[in-house]
């Protein structure tokens, strides 16, 4: 079976991950002690994607929980789902990374990383046919970003041919937790470009917007935000875990979504998002789901898909529905909004259908898009990065842990290259020879304007 080993790193990663395990356990009918209490054999048929069956038919999540301080892991241990996890899979140090990427990547994290890789190796050895890893972390702090990227590169060395999918919480434009977020994020993106296969970009501000605008929550908590993310996480792998008419897995996703190896940063969305109060007044239909997943207000990262073009996209529908209708709707989206899709990749939407809907719903849809507008997110981080780096603000915290300024410069230029690659493909067209010169000229003009504005 196609198992996935789940690794959650740092405070954010562990909180999102804990919520994810609640959602998946509910879908498979597993209670907090790890025993099966479900009502249909379909829940057990491919349960071993995320769970390992141990003696006494107890199901244990294939999860590795990592942090540089004990706090969050202790609270997961004490929570209602704490007893599900294998106690050996909790790995933590005492000192914390203090929002410092260098501590997570080079000093504190480097001491812990070997023991984490051992745990990951044990989990991988329990698998018949390991498909890949999913990593949950944030890029703004120290542990998730520093230790998270270190772990990704270590796992990559050991399992070079397995998929590496990350759920990365990006720093938001308006909501900032720490001053040094731009540094941590830029250094992390530098690593993710090289070592990850698929990066799902999430950011808190977009999640807050969904909670305020769509779900009508007046005071959204992190629990609410994490619940949104976990819905997408479970949706992406639904096809692996339940029988479906059109299946997809992490590798099929990558093959269909990534036209060029560096461009693997995705926007994700989920439907139906409705306020609890309005739940009873909504009929769910395939056209409505399709319309909602392509809506910019549904994206979980603060980039507007209307500012860019889709290179590729993928949608996973769950529930009893006709595949013909799904295909028609997807085709309709493409023909109606053809200017938002690049014309040099015909039929660039992949759709898959899974027969089992999420708990308590008739149908749902998960969306993953590779849109050039994601460059907005990198540009924003890049501007904040260069503003601080020009003055060498806060650098001593990083150089003190043995980093070199050169690494910052490299990370910055790698991210700038990424932005210009996205821009290049946004402007590219089918008959490109003539166009390319124009695009370069335009691109040059655009950059100058931006500099003046700034």
UniProtKB/Swiss-Prot annotation:
GO terms for molecular function: GTP binding; GTPase activity; metal ion binding; structural constituent of cytoskeleton. Residues 429-441 have a biased composition (Acidic residues). The keyword Nucleotide-binding applies. Residues 426-454 are annotated as: Disordered. PANTHER family: TUBULIN. Tubulin is the major constituent of microtubules, a cylinder consisting of laterally associated linear protofilaments composed of alpha- and beta-tubulin heterodimers. Microtubules grow by the addition of GTP-tubulin dimers to the microtubule end, where a stabilizing cap forms. Below the cap, tubulin dimers are in GDP-bound state, owing to GTPase activity of alpha-tubulin. Dimer of alpha and beta chains. A typical microtubule is a hollow water-filled tube with an outer diameter of 25 nm and an inner diameter of 15 nM. Alpha-beta heterodimers associate head-to-tail to form protofilaments running lengthwise along the microtubule wall with the beta-tubulin subunit facing the microtubule plus end conferring a structural polarity. Microtubules usually have 13 protofilaments but different protofilament numbers can be found in some organisms and specialized cells. Belongs to the tubulin family. This is Tubulin beta-2 chain. It comes from Physarum polycephalum (Slime mold). The lineage of its organism: Eukaryota, Amoebozoa, Evosea, Eumycetozoa, Myxogastria.
């Amino acid at each position: 079976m196609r198992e996935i080993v789940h690794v959650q790193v740092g405070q954010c990663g562990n909180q999102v991950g804990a919520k994810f395990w609640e959602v998946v356990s509910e879908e498979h009918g597993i209670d907090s002690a790890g025993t099966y209490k479900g009502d249909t054999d379909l829940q057990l048929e491919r349960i071993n994607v995320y769970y390992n069956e141990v003696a006494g038919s107890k199901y244990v999540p294939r999860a590795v929980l990592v942090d540089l301080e004990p706090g969050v892991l202790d609270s997961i241990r004490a929570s209602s789902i704490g007893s599900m996890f294998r106690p050996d899979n909790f790995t933590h140090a005492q000192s914390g990374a203090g929002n410092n990427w260098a501590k997570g990547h080079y000093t504190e994290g480097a001491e812990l990383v070997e023991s984490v890789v051992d745990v990951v190796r044990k989990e991988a050895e329990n698998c018949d046919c390991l498909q890949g890893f999913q990593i949950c972390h944030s890029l703004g702090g120290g542990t998730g970003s520093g230790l998270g990227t270190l772990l990704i590169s270590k796992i990559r060395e050991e399992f070079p041919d397995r998929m590496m999918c990350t759920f990365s919480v990006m720093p938001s434009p308006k909501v900032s937790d720490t001053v040094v977020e731009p540094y941590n994020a830029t250094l992390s993106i530098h690593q993710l470009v090289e070592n990850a296969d698929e990066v799902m970009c999430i950011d808190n501000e977009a999640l807050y917007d969904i909670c305020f605008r769509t779900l009508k929550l007046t005071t959204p908590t992190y629990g609410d935000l994490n619940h949104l993310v976990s819905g997408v996480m479970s949706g992406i792998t639904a096809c692996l875990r339940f029988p479906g008419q059109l299946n997809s897995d992490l590798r099929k996703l990558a093959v269909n979504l990534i036209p060029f190896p560096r461009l693997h940063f995705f926007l994700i969305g989920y439907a139906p998002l409705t306020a609890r109060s309005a739940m009873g007044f909504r009929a769910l239909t395939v056209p409505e789901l399709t319309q909602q997943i392509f809506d910019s207000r549904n994206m979980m990262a603060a980039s507007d898909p209307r500012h860019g073009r889709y290179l590729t996209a993928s949608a996973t529908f769950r529930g009893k529905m006709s595949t013909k209708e799904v295909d028609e709707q997807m085709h309709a989206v493409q023909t109606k909004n053809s200017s938002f899709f690049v014309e040099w990749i015909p039929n660039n939407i992949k759709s898959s259908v899974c027969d089992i809907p999420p708990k308590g719903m008739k149908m749902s849809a998960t969306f993953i898009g590779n849109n050039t507008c994601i460059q907005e997110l990198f540009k924003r981080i890049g501007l904040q990065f260069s503003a601080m780096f020009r003055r060498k603000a806060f650098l001593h915290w990083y150089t003190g842990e043995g980093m070199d300024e050169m690494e910052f410069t490299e990370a910055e230029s790698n991210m700038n290259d990424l932005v210009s690659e996205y821009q290049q493909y946004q402007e590219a067209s089918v008959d490109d020879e003539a166009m390319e010169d124009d695009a370069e000229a335009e691109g040059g003009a655009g950059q100058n304007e931006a500099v003046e504005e700034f």
